[in-house]
């Protein structure tokens, strides 16, 4: 059995392919071809990020690869500068629009780095609630975190 057909099972029961196409350093103009070639080879896990600047091309590749969308595990990442729930949620909606997709299987916080005010805040409880909130599916079920 090829590693391309092997999966890990996440704690929530969702299966993620063990091997995925990482698209860092793939230009947006080349991303669709790269995704289509990877899917033709057997890849079913495609990874991009807002910071890579290639979500449009990756989405095009996903939409035009010839494999049904529900058979692909598509992941993107919220850019590190989005520090609030509102900003992160807006950026996820923008990602879906750029990619031309209705949903992503996983959205990751890319390189979560604290900011200078993190320990200065009087509102850490409320800020912490945003992490709990984004761990639930978005109210439109257009993406899952």
Regions found by a protein language model. Give the residues of each.
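N-terminal binding-site loop/beta-alpha segment at the start of enzyme catalytic domains
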Residues: 1-72, 89-90, 102
């Amino acid at each position: 059995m090829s590693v391309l057909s092997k999966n890990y099972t996440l704690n929530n029961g969702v299966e993620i392919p063990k091997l995925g196409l990482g698209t860092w350093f793939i230009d947006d103009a080349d991303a669709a071809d790269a995704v289509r070639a990877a899917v033709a080879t057997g890849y079913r896990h495609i990874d991009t990020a807002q910071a890579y600047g290639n979500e449009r091309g990756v989405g095009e590749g996903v939409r035009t690869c010839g494999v049904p969308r529900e058979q692909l595990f598509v992941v993107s990442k919220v850019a590190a500068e989005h520090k609030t729930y509102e900003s992160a949620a807006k950026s996820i909606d923008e990602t879906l629009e750029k990619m031309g997709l209705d949903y992503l299987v996983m959205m990751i916080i890319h390189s979560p780095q604290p900011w200078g005010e993190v320990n200065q805040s009087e509102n850490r409880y409320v800020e912490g609630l945003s992490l709990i909130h984004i761990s639930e599916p978005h109210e439109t079920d257009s993406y899952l975190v």
